[in-house]
């Protein structure tokens, strides 16, 4: 490893180390939200709510592709960071090679089992009438790009795992920048509508994945793309999948939750789906910034779990304080100019009113949601596979009954409030799990929460 990477892992001031690892991730996730918003923003100029709904309905599929990337990216990435903390550099080459080609194989399987059934999958997602064909066309492009989307998530995690967060950010910047350029060209110039939006995202992911491959081939002595090293053994599989499977389940259940939510919203009409799609993109700004903060420090936590547990504790305290500051700023913004923010995407006043309401409700859960992100990251970083698995299952198990109960009692308003209730319960569950495992983490969780 390079001396600079070791410096941030071991010696730099905690806040400086946190920002070194997290800031590129925060910027990258923020930019990814921007091009997600731009898809809807550009499509919004066509003044067709069916197209906005089509893009919104595909969110669960993207969550599943992200989950497949996390299966190897998070699982192998945290393992690589622990190996580096233990100074076992050679083993990381075998871990990375197996994960890269495993991810590509998964992507090819996705194409084979989904592409012939894109119409049926669109219907399952809740697409009806005019929205059905639009959603199906968007999905076809997503499925064809699956190997590169999965590979992008894996390689981006590896860049952070080895202490090169700036490379991670550059890769994401390249992807976002290219997508911003391609969207208007493909949507308007070639008159491809939602297919143009999907193609812009797909091409951008291909370019970013190729960037990471070239970087690792030329610059890394701990991550290998040599297929000859893709030889797993029992220990490697155990270490990768005990964290990778919970990360995968978390994304899959997030996608399943999105599917169930879409079905509930579809019952209340196209305006409900479009309203949620707009508010979801706006909530993603602070949510993914916080997620970037929490995911960014996972390699730092994983490394110091092996090398310096006192430093690990200081990192966690700094992250909690940062989450609190972000929460306060975002709440002020949403409750003062939220209506104007939503108005950027549509002139339909019914959608503006509903999306603003959803935005305020979901933003309220940001603080506990952020704590949940952090504690889930701690479980992943420290190799607590059982705790991470329980947390992943709970995230899916909690939201479904809450949705059914709130919908039965309060209708559409209940569906919206169920998001806040479920997020809060998940965060409390994460805090409880970390507290119960505190001896293994050697972190006094109650002290962190109080201090």
UniProtKB/Swiss-Prot annotation:
A GO CC term attached to the entry: plasma membrane
Record's keyword annotation contains Coiled coil? no
**Compartments, as annotated in UniProt:** Cell membrane
Q: Which GO terms describe its biological process?
A: response to antibiotic
Q: Which UniProt keywords apply?
A: Antibiotic resistance, Cell membrane, Membrane, Transmembrane, Transmembrane helix, Transport
Which Pfam families does the UniProt record give? Answer: MatE (PF01554)
Q: Which top-level group of life is the source organism from?
A: Bacteria
Transmembrane ranges, per UniProt, are 26-46, 54-74, 97-117, 139-159, 170-190, 194-214, 245-265, 282-302, 318-338, 355-375, 397-417, 418-438
Molecular functions (GO terms): antiporter activity; xenobiotic transmembrane transporter activity
Q: Which InterPro entries match?
A: MATE_fam, MATE_MepA-like, MATE_MepA_subfamily, MdtK-like
Membrane topology, as annotated, equals: Multi-pass membrane protein
User: Which family is annotated?
Assistant: Belongs to the multi antimicrobial extrusion (MATE) (TC 2.A.66.1) family. MepA subfamily.
Which NCBIfam families does the UniProt entry name for this protein?
Answer: matE, MATE_multi_MepA
Q: Which PANTHER family match?
A: MULTIDRUG EXPORT PROTEIN MEPA (PTHR43823:SF3), SPORULATION PROTEIN YKVU (PTHR43823)
Q: What biological function has been recorded for the protein in this entry? A: Multidrug resistance efflux protein.
Name of the featured protein: Multidrug export protein MepA
State the organism of origin.
Staphylococcus aureus (strain MSSA476)
Whichever gene encodes this chain, its name is: mepA
């Amino acid at each position: 490893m390079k001396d600079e990477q070791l410096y941030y892992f071991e010696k730099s001031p905690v806040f400086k180390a946190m920002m070194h690892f997290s800031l590129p991730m925060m910027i990258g996730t923020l930019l990814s939200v921007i091009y997600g918003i731009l898809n809807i923003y550009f499509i919004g100029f066509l003044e067709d709510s069916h197209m906005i709904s089509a893009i919104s309905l595909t969110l669960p599929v993207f969550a599943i592709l992200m989950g497949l990337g996390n299966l190897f990216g998070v699982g192998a990435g945290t393992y690589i960071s622990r190996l580096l903390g233990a100074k076992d550099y050679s083993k990381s080459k075998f871990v990375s090679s197996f994960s890269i080609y495993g991810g590509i194989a998964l992507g090819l399987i996705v194409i084979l089992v989904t592409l012939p059934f894109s119409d049926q999958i669109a219907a399952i997602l809740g697409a009806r009438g005019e929205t059905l064909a639009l959603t199906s066309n968007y999905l076809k492009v997503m499925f064809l790009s699956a190997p590169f989307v999965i590979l992008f998530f894996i390689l981006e995690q590896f860049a952070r795992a080895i202490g090169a967060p700036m490379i991670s950010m550059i890769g994401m910047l390249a992807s976002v920048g290219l997508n911003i350029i391609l969207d208007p060209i493909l949507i308007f110039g070639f008159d491809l509508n939602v297919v143009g939006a999907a193609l812009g995202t797909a091409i951008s992911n291909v370019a970013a994945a190729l960037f990471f491959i070239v970087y690792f081939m030329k610059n890394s002595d701990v991550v290998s793309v040599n297929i000859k090293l893709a030889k797993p053994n029992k220990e490697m599989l155990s270490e990768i999948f005990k964290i990778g499977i919970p990360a995968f389940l978390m994304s899959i259940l997030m996608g399943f939750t999105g599917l169930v939510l879409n079905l509930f919203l579809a019952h209340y009409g196209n305006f409900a789906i479009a309203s949620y799609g707009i508010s979801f993109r706006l909530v993603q700004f602070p949510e993914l910034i916080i997620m970037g903060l929490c995911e960014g420090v996972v390699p730092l936590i994983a490394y110091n779990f092996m090398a310096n547990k006192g430093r690990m504790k200081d990192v966690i305290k700094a992250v909690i304080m940062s989450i609190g500051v972000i929460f306060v700023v975002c709440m002020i913004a949403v409750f003062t100019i939220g209506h104007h923010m939503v108005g950027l995407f549509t002139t339909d006043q019914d959608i503006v009113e509903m999306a603003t309401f959803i935005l305020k409700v979901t933003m309220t859960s940001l603080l506990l949601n952020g704590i949940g992100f952090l504690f889930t990251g701690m479980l992943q970083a420290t190799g607590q596979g059982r705790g991470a698995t329980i947390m992943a299952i709970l995230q899916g198990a909690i939201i479904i009954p809450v949705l059914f109960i709130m919908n039965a009692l309060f209708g559409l308003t209940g569906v919206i409030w169920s998001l806040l209730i479920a997020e809060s319960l998940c965060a409390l569950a994460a805090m409880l799990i970390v507290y119960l495992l505190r001896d293994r983490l050697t972190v006094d969780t109650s002290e962190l929460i109080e201090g």
